[in-house]
């Protein structure tokens, strides 16, 4: 691997560790030319399916968009970042487990709702109200009744 400081090809790994989740490796490297140290991370390259929108348009799966959609209903809710990160990983794992080349946006929304329901009921209701286009109070009451 090239040194990010001097561009030399002569670097060596001086330490490797697997992260807590077991899905990536952290490597400390040293450049033999300039003697500077740097860290790299190795993860598996996963090909996520394309998302098929309700209008039939297809777009690449976007983790940042997923994070934004997931965290918006959690705004001002007492949910630790670790829970959010874990839930987002669960969502990605569920998508990958399907083994499909495409996923319907509505199916992705249902998976997001399941994860929100598991970590924060208020966020779940907030998301459901937008995702399912609630029209009146009865729609909210139906979802709240289903929580019990």
UniProtKB/Swiss-Prot annotation:
| All residue ranges annotated as the ATP-cone domain in the record | 49-139
Q: Origin, by domain of life?
A: Bacteria
Instruction: Tell me any Pfam family this protein matches.
Output: ATP-cone
Q: Which GO terms describe its biological process?
A: negative regulation of DNA-templated transcription
Q: Which family does it belong to?
A: Belongs to the NrdR family.
Q: Which PANTHER family match?
A: TRANSCRIPTIONAL REPRESSOR NRDR
What protein am I looking at? Answer: Transcriptional repressor NrdR
């Amino acid at each position: 691997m090239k040194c990010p400081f001097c561009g030399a090809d002569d670097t060596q790994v001086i330490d490797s560790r697997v992260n807590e989740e077991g899905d990536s490796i952290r490597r400390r490297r040293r450049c033999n030319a300039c003697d500077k140290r740097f860290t790299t991370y190795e993860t598996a390259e996963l090909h996520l399916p394309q998302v098929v929108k309700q209008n039939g348009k297809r777009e690449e799966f976007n983790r940042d968009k997923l994070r934004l959609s997931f965290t918006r209903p959690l705004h001002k809710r007492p949910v630790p970042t670790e829970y959010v990160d874990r839930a987002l990983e669960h969502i990605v794992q569920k998508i990958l487990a399907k083994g499909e080349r495409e996923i319907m946006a509505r199916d992705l929304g249902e998976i997001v709702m399941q994860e929100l329901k598991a970590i924060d009921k208020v966020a779940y209701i907030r998301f459901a109200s937008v995702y399912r286009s609630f029209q009146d109070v009865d729609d909210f009451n139906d979802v709240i009744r289903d929580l019990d």
